[in-house]
Amino acid sequence: MGKATYTVTVTNNSNGVSVDYETETPMTLLVPEVAAEVIKDLVNTVRSYDTENEHDVCGW
């Protein structure tokens, strides 16, 4: 039996693009700097798929 993984997902509702971050240690996300970096990376990845309607995506 494998280790449990936990997933953080960011989705752009205007175009349906979704990106995930998986971790086996969700407690690390309680560290504000770590959580901010994870979310920033996810948002930037989602944003890279939206070239025409940038105002529809959460800016960072």
Swiss-Prot record:
InterPro entries: YoaG, YoaG_sf. Pfam families: DUF1869 (PF08956). Gene3D superfamilies: YoaG. Homodimer. This is Protein YoaG. It comes from Escherichia coli (strain K12).
